[in-house]
Swiss-Prot record:
This is Ribosome-binding factor A. Disulfide bonds: none annotated. Monomer. Binds 30S ribosomal subunits, but not 50S ribosomal subunits or 70S ribosomes. Gene3D superfamilies: 3.30.300.20. GO terms for biological process: maturation of SSU-rRNA; ribosome biogenesis. Belongs to the RbfA family. The gene is rbfA. PANTHER family: RIBOSOME-BINDING FACTOR A, CHLOROPLASTIC-RELATED. The lineage of its organism: Bacteria, Bacillati, Bacillota, Bacilli, Bacillales. GO terms for cellular component: cytosol. It comes from Listeria monocytogenes serovar 1/2a (strain ATCC BAA-679 / EGD-e).
């Protein structure tokens, strides 16, 4: 990724966090945290990695709410960030936090056994 793509990625992450927490009023939207945004070098596509707190059903409902609000989110990003073309976004669940917690739990269990 080039320098401009990195800058756009960080700005999108910040703005998406604000939009998801303050602007979208969908009750299906659970507790969502934007953990990262990967923007392609040509700024045409962006993968938005999110962490969702809750059950699998709540995660599924949150993804449905995000899919429904996709157009609104994209237009808000367009208003907040000056770009010629707003990247097409896809939302993916980031399981790295749960994975990290599991590793931490296993390490604690090992220390308690010793």
């Amino acid at each position: 990724m080039n320098v401009r793509a990195n800058r756009v990625s960080e700005q999108m992450k910040k703005e998406l966090g604000d939009i998801l927490n303050r602007k979208i009023k969908d009750p299906r939207l659970g507790f969502v945290t934007v953990t990262g945004v990967d923007v392609t070098g040509d700024l045409q596509e962006a993968k938005v990695f999110i962490s969702i707190l809750g059950t699998d059903k709540e995660k599924e409902n949150t993804l449905l709410a995000l899919a429904k609000a996709h157009g609104f989110i994209r237009s808000e990003i367009g208003r907040r960030i000056r770009l010629r073309k707003v990247p097409e976004m896809s939302f993916e669940i980031d399981n790295s936090i749960a994975y990290g917690n599991r590793i931490d739990e296993l390490l604690r269990d090992l220390n308690n056994d010793q």
